[in-house]
């Protein structure tokens, strides 16, 4: 594993020291897309990235909610863009974003589409991060509900929320209920960092960005009541430029390991107070990467 830090200390070592050894946990099966998904809290921080040269697109996420709908937040349309729909998740809004990506709409257009309080009574509980590409131009746009922003800005606030992006590098990082702003700031820095050893593929950048957010503290709910876990669920999905679009039809990590899954689809879930899932996600990712390289 290669880290983004110039000190030479790897993220794997930092995570191991801070969070303890990792153990595999069974992946939870969750409600289908017909269930009351808009009442479920989804995703504390996520990273959306695109490669305008190859057309590859991907999303990585982590949350303290163990029974999260991790895979459902992602909308991937190779060659056009990717998005994360999170906080108070609504599959209908995810589908709107997905359809707009397939239509080739810009990131700003997509955010306008889903940030209208007239059509969404729960807009204040939503968060989005979108990255689009067209004709070599990359655009980023994000949205965080005002109540989340107001709460993060309050005196002595302990639940930071917001979006940070870098359009020139094709990345957007968004999060809510975070320990502090460093979770997204460090994730963004990790994503754009150039590993001198060459571990700079889209998937490499996504996973090291997610790890950097974990090292910064992650989800405040997993860092309270003597628990120092940062997350309970972690996931990464990537589709290549030549692949078809992807947004899961049956949420609950059910596509993992099936023909429906995108080129890269890895997830892991642990119980609250258990081992940090980012460690197991890295182990699975490194194994996947070695297998892909051999092939």
Predicted regions and their residues:
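N-terminal secretory signal peptides that target proteins for export/translocation
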Residues: 1-5
